[in-house]
Amino acid sequence: FKGGGPYGQGVTRG
C-alpha cells in the first residue's frame, strides 16, 4: 500500500 507505511510518506512497502 502507499501512504500507510511506518513513515506515511507514500512508501510502496512498509
Curated annotation (Swiss-Prot):
Keywords: Chloroplast, Plastid, Thylakoid. Its main location: plastid. Signal peptide: none annotated. GO terms for cellular component: chloroplast; chloroplast thylakoid; thylakoid. It is found in: Plastid, Chloroplast thylakoid. On the 2D-gel the determined pI of this protein is: 5.7, its MW is: 14.3 kDa. This is Unknown protein from spot 103 of 2D-PAGE of thylakoid. It comes from Pisum sativum.
